[in-house]
Amino acid sequence: MKKTILLAWVGIGALCAACTSSNNTSVVKDGAGNELFVAHYQEIKDTVVINLSDLVEDYELIRFEDNDSALLGFRVMPTITEHYIGVSQRRGQPYLLFDRQGNFLCNVGNVGQGPGEYAWQIYDAAISEQKGEVYLAQFAFSPKIFAYNLQGKLTREIETGCTLSKPKIEMDDEGNLCVVQIPMPSQKSLNLAIQMDGSGNVTRTLKAEERFWMDDFNGDLFAYHNVPEFSFHITCCDTLFHYDRTENRVVPKYTLDFGMMDEKPGHIYNEIPGYYMTTVFGKGIILTDKQKCTSYYVKFINDLYGGISHPVTFKDGYVFTLREPTHWIHYIEKRLASDDCSDTDRKQLTELLESIDEEGNHLMFIGKLK
């Protein structure tokens, strides 16, 4: 029978111990010293309740500016830095730039066919505060990454040397840009990875093995930028990989073993410091502890805001929830209706509920990961 375990953590470090074997997780080592973690899906039974205060070093609730230019749509995906939040929306809408107080700064470029305009939805973005630039990569069909200043004006077009398909981009501390994309023979683009220097010159490419090839756009590439390594998951290859920039190679790091299941559930891999993570559609989130070599389902509780429970995303070294006001009202009212809501939590949540404008723009809980 599945059981739920409540851990009172001092912090993430409290779970770090010598690696021990478990019945639900294996580690496969190759001759080069790499470790591949394999979590055995059908053996994962327990659920651990984790307070968000154990994961973050600071947190805030951001109320995005409420005007027609700044309104956010459904299922938006932010790019987060210390001082900025960029938001990619559905096709036909420009990329929006905000400061960390939620103030709308500008549209970054615009939708269209002209110079510096993008015809397709922005699939990924990077923001360099050091260089004062925002980098936008379109969904597909373009061999360029557009660079804009923090006022939203085009500064340069970075040629990647091939047409990109669902690219993910990262910039290191030295200003070097790295792209990982889905290789598609139909698009005559077989590079899996492309490295560029700070001036935008291509310095290295990595041709994709056939296992990474896709014939159409029915799959996806996921990269959440939470760890120093370029950690990514292409859905046609059921493994989370690291792209090693120095060695110019990909290294398998994590996968779920579904055994003899006739139909595997849909799932997405992610990685945060100390853990691999799998979102299993219709089932929940699995964490695999790299130190303890064990896996379990996890339920996150926002003890920083009255113990409410809400979906969370881990990206760019942060944990966040970005939702419309009606969603937040639902989360709060559900918690207020629970029997175990303390007087302290009830007071905090009631004040928060009264401060929310149901017709306003999105609210974002955000915490920086330890």
Where are these regions (language model features)?
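Asp-box/WD-like beta-propeller blade repeats and closely related beta-sheet repeat scaffolds
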Residues: 119-122, 139-189, 206-209
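Blade-loop segments of beta-propeller domains
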Residues: 65-75, 103-131, 138
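Conserved blade-ending motifs and adjacent loop-strand segments that build the rim/top face
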Residues: 251-271, 292-317, 329
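Short beta-strand elements that form the blades of beta-propeller/WD-repeat-like
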Residues: 36-37, 83-90, 132-138, 175-186, ...
